[in-house]
Curated annotation (Swiss-Prot):
Homodimer. The active site is at 263. It catalyses: D-glycero-beta-D-manno-heptose 7-phosphate + ATP = D-glycero-beta-D-manno-heptose 1,7-bisphosphate + ADP + H(+); D-glycero-beta-D-manno-heptose 1-phosphate + ATP + H(+) = ADP-D-glycero-beta-D-manno-heptose + diphosphate. GO terms for biological process: ADP-L-glycero-beta-D-manno-heptose biosynthetic process. Residues 1-318 are annotated as: Ribokinase. This is Bifunctional protein HldE. It comes from Aliarcobacter butzleri (strain RM4018) (Arcobacter butzleri). The lineage of its organism: Bacteria, Pseudomonadati, Campylobacterota, Epsilonproteobacteria, Campylobacterales.
């Protein structure tokens, strides 16, 4: 357990990420553009602010130094920081500067437009002096410094080098989320956290195999005089090079959104190092944190409890973790709806699994993003099929079905029909067998769409049981 609450300083470009959510169903009569009916809007900390958010949710003590304007966006930014109890006393105001705000217009879960209002000029000399003065007074209280560079003018080459020099004199590690192609301004820092594309641009090395990866890591380490070089490799994990190459594989099970995952990585590494983990252990911890975050929508964060729970779940049976109770599936379905995922629902007894079942479920899964299967409990099967059924009990049937790639979640229901379960899930697509053609299907008044899937001819549990019984007669 990581129990320390290290004091970490974040210096960089603060901004507001502003979201407008709505729907679009017509074209403007004034110009060939979509008309979006905005239904809600929200604002969150962006840029270096997302790093701060990540550190805060991990339980870290966080200080921030940045330069902002004297405007409404700055006031909004301060308010968001104060909500998470982050001091704004070290935010330096330049009157002619625009505080960065990025607005994204999202319609039907698709981003259709982004517009930015900001200044990207270098900060002035007075701001530079104030930052250095503040740092020199307080440097000894920090376990590490994160430089979050978004190229908006705060982290000038001179300021960056001055920060690194002061930190090194006081044995404080500097971790950098870099920007641009020239990384020379970060020389002397502890490590950088570029992604693969950024590393390729900075080193002019095409990373296509292990040798080219090592060459890129070596190039970064030598040119920037790093203690350790890192490259984040998306779904492949994180590559580390001190004297030898180590790749920490990703541990994400479900990826919904990678937005802000880089901020989670650098924050988690700094937090772990502040808890006396070595760099390999810190990167493993960061991989777990990123695994949680990419399962959420937008620039998300994670808590220590979520990380520990996630790590624990990775060691559990994969099939068991996909078998849910009514309460669990209700919460999960709500989350999936919020993430904009298309939910497919089907149900049945699935007593003796055969190829017809498998093909049916594969087709059902193709109609959306997530397939939830309602499984008749043993008592329900007996009512439908007779006292001799089921052949396999409900736990065995659920486990086997949950192990199929096409099935995301299984829920056992005791009732004669899955109507109450469907009400909880509110699926977008309801799938039933082709033999329901022209018949009423339970739950079709709840789902947006009904799909009827043809069965494979001659394949059924009843036929399978008959063949087994006939073979037994022949053998007796």
């Amino acid at each position: 357990m990581l129990s320390k609450k290290p004091n970490i300083l974040v210096i960089g470009d603060l901004m507001i990420d502003h979201y407008l959510w709505g729907s679009c169903d017509r074209i403007s009569p004034e110009a060939p553009v979509q008309v979006v009916n905005v239904k809600k809007e929200s604002s969150v900390l962006g840029g270096a602010g997302n790093v701060i958010n990540n550190l805060f949710t991990l339980g870290t003590t966080v200080d921030v130094i940045s330069v902002i304007g004297d405007d409404n966006v700055a006031n909004e930014l301060k308010s968001l920081l104060e909500k998470i109890k982050i001091s704004t006393s070290n935010l330096i105001v330049e009157n002619n500067r625009k505080t960065s705000k990025k607005s994204r217009l999202i319609a039907s879960q698709q981003q259709v437009l982004r517009y930015d209002m900001e200044s990207i000029d270098d900060i002035n000399e007075e701001s530079h002096k104030k930052i250095i003065s503040n740092l020199e007074k307080n440097i000894k209280k920090y376990s590490s410094i994160i430089l979050s560079d978004y190229g908006k003018g705060v982290l000038t080459t001179k300021l960056t080098q001055d920060i690194i020099n002061i930190a090194n004199k006081n044995s404080v590690k500097v971790l950098v989320d870099p920007k641009g192609k020239d990384y020379s301004k970060y020389k002397g820092s502890y490590t950088l956290t570029p992604n693969k594309k950024e590393a390729q641009e900075a080193t002019n090395i095409d990373i296509k195999d292990e040798n080219s990866l090592i060459n890129a890591l070596k190039d970064l380490k030598e040119k920037c005089d790093l203690e350790v070089s890192l490259i984040t490799l998306s779904e492949q994990g994180i590559a580390i090079f001190d004297e030898n190459l180590t790749i920490k594989p990703t541990v994400a099970r479900e990826v919904y959104d990678v937005t802000g995952a880089g901020d989670t990585v650098i924050a988690s590494i700094a937090f772990a190092l502040g808890n006396d983990l070595n760099i390999n252990e810190a990167v493993s911890f960061a991989n777990l944190a990123a695994g949680v975050v990419v399962g959420k929508l937008g620039s998300a964060t994670t808590t220590l409890d979520e990380i520990y729970e996630y790590e624990s779940s990775l060691h559990k049976s994969n099939s068991n973790s996909h078998i849910k109770t009514f309460e669990e599936i209700e919460k999960l379905a709500a989350k999936l709806h919020n993430l904009g995922k298309k939910i497919v629902f089907t149900n049945g007894c699935f007593d003796i699994l055969h190829v017809g079942h498998v093909k049916y479920l594969e087709e059902a899964r193709s109609y959306g993003d997530v397939l939830i299967l309602g499984l008749n409990a043993d008592s329900s099967v007996k009512k439908l099929k007779g006292e001799s059924r089921p052949i396999n009990n409900q736990d065995d049937r659920a486990y086997i079905l949950a192990s199929l790639e096409s099935v995301d979640y299984v829920v056992i229901f005791e009732e004669e029909t899955p109507y109450e379960l469907i009400k909880l899930i509110k699926p977008h697509v309801l799938v039933k067998g082709g033999d329901y053609e022209g018949k009423d299907v339970v739950g079709q008044d709840i789902a947006d769409e009904l799909k009827l899937v043809k069965f494979v001819d001659g394949k059924s549990t009843t036929n399978t049981i008959k063949r087994i019984q006939e073979n037994e007669k022949c053998n007796n």
